């Protein structure tokens, strides 16, 4: 092995019209060559990336998508996902999903499908790990509470892009590749389809993950019973969490093989849609959670108004970010974890211990 202060490489044989000769290749170059030889013609090759907003020297060890993945994992916003609610605002016990465990579920499903389809697993993983970085505290209630202040819908996917572009790394952003950024901002089903098949996989993996683990959490919380689960979708998808995920991932791989887009077969997609409709009716929009939802919404709105009136009390990085004051306040509020938002509200508005006394 040849090493220097700036590069790492191996001597390998190369063939040209002049015969065999030695060349130095880096681990990254060998990975890129393996991608060219092994991956599907429809895969996104790291060596063919559209690049970054700011050009950077190549890394000897990692491809561009591997570097993006690592940057996301080391981001502060990624670490905060462990204290952000997925669905249940006040879960009792340690087994309920939060944004971080959801993100890891999505990543695992996306990697499995990408590998099976000979697509770029590193790209799929990076998009999956970054897709929820912009989510608010208290789940979707947080984004609904922010919308009236902004004069436009607060979209977590757009906020995730803002996080990686402007808010991380002391305002310099993570400078991710075009493909990862496209996959992050276009992962919701309300957006145009992402440009890469890897990002389309993440879009499906997100829905597969959240519907199935939300069913699992609802059963654990006593919100649903096994007997209440919809018979039609359960018959198609399976009776258990693992059966349902296996059915969906296996179907996605079979239906997407050598196709120009990622898809499910019609019966399985219909069953997934049926399960989603059921979850919205029975779990996500349940009337008996309205009091809890109202408290979370009020907390977000009062915090927003406070920092709108006292912007100097926000950390310095939120003053450097581009955008008007409401946008920068939304940056700060949406970046809070559930417990940090509660502590901040308590510190600003309530006698010590009041929130805890309320149960």
Model-identified regions with their sequence ranges:
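Short active-site segment of divalent metal-dependent hydrolases/proteases
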Residues: 134-135, 209
